[in-house]
Amino acid sequence: MTFPILILAAPTGAGKTSLITELDPTRFEILSFDSRQIYREMPIGTAAPTKEQQSKIRHHLVEVLSPKESIDAGLYNRMAEEALQKVLNTDKIPVFTAGTGFYLKAFLFGMFPVPEISVSVRERVLSMSIEEKKVLLNDLDPEALDKIFSGDDYRLGRALEVNLMGEKWSRLKIDPNTSAIYKYNLEIRLGIFLDLDRKELYERINLRAKRMIDLGMADEAWEIRERYGESCPGLKSLGYNFALENKKGNSNVETFLVDLSQSHRNYAKRQITWFRKENYIQAMDRSEALERIKHIK
């Protein structure tokens, strides 16, 4: 027996959350693959679904970790597997929503058998800029650097961690036994990439950034800093560095808006690059996506 699943991927600001709330809650439940929205206490800067939106359809893996906790593909896999089992037991169809494509792909198709990373190595890599990571990775494993998209800070960091633990990241092979598709006999009935005109997407992102600032993202960031420290993993999420700089008085609100908008546009560009090369999803607009989902059995 196979279990049908849906995949809904989209760049930040594309309207994925609002589309989700239009789905039939008696037929579907959401498994979120988003490395930012998994954190609690940070709803403004992560644009997490509101309580009202979550009440319309069951969400899993949203606002479940403390900002002081680290997240990686291995932990995400374990949490996602627990959530998937719950959904399959309801006879509903799981909808995998993705902003973080790497986590989704690792869960569905399998993970690399990476060594356990020591605290000292993880802290060292976290303290490095993306350019510093590239330089060191080029020295240790140039083949790995060639395989990783230059703007993918997460994968650069993970590859560097593996190499610093004494193994070549470029020589690792995916273990198919860790694939959820294989383990749970899943069938991708429909894979959607929510496609927007680039100009429209950037306008939406700019408006979202302004709304985040108006709602108090700087205060939210400062409260997290006071509670868990400035180096806590949650504050590594997109845009919080600019929020803290604003709160410290090192930038005005105009600069904050420019920097926040630009960082979100750059992130969206990287997401689009990632998802466009994945063959298990196809680009379509919102209306077509909703119509196709309605007819899934």
Curated annotation (Swiss-Prot):
ATP binds at residues 10-17. InterPro entries: Dimethylallyltransferase, IPT, P-loop_NTPase. Keywords: ATP-binding, Magnesium, Nucleotide-binding, Transferase, tRNA processing. Gene3D superfamilies: Crystal structure of tRNA isopentenylpyrophosphate transferase (bh2366) domain (1.10.287.890), P-loop containing nucleotide triphosphate hydrolases (3.40.50.300). It catalyses: adenosine(37) in tRNA + dimethylallyl diphosphate = N(6)-dimethylallyladenosine(37) in tRNA + diphosphate. Its EC number is 2.5.1.75. Its cofactor is Mg(2+). Pfam families: IPPT (PF01715). This is tRNA dimethylallyltransferase. It comes from Leptospira interrogans serogroup Icterohaemorrhagiae serovar Lai (strain 56601). The gene is miaA.
